[in-house]
Amino acid sequence: IARNWEITRKLRGMAILFQEEMQLDARPAGQVSPRRADGPTEIPPETLNRLHSKLDATYARYGNRTLEMDIYRPKDAWGNLPAIVCIHGGGWRKGSKIHHRKVAQALAARGFVTASIDYRLSGEAPFPAHIQDCKAAVRFLRANAKEYGIDPDNIGAIGHSAAGHLAALLATSARVPELEGEGGNAEFSSAIQAVVPMGGQTDFLSERTRD
């Protein structure tokens, strides 16, 4: 897996905080499930006031279909900041960029440029559309690095559940042309330098998974 140690160290710290905030709900059958990353925990207003936000930035187009991201960065720092693509979970079939908004805001408050992204879900487009969109998001950030004050050589990704799978695949498929897609900025690399995949599905071949 691609790894830049300084970015990964900070991302791991945020992953620990993220997991601590995922409180468990009791279920009648004894099951438990985490709360959404956009659940009841609030980002303090003073933290939000220190962030610059660009919402609904279009990063890819497929005919009349546009994909958007919400970009956050600290107001008191500009230029050559590491960037993080924040990918939402939802079983590849539901969710949106707002479900990772607080993770993106919390990371931005710690000195990153963050991009919480939408991507095509399985009801709209089959695999590999999801990962192609994630790669298009990375290429967009790299292509617009000067505008958003990003270090193009230090881009990472974070995701939980289905997004953990996409983040891991993003980190390990930089040289797989079939997964690049046609989301634009083809002259830029989709490689990332750090990744924190949390609880992602990685075994798609076992009998249990197929069932």
Residue ranges of predicted features:
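Short beta-to-alpha linker loops that shape the active-site pocket of alpha/beta-hydrolase fold enzymes
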Residues: 75, 90, 113, 118-122, ...
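Short beta-strand element of the alpha/beta-hydrolase
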Residues: 79-89
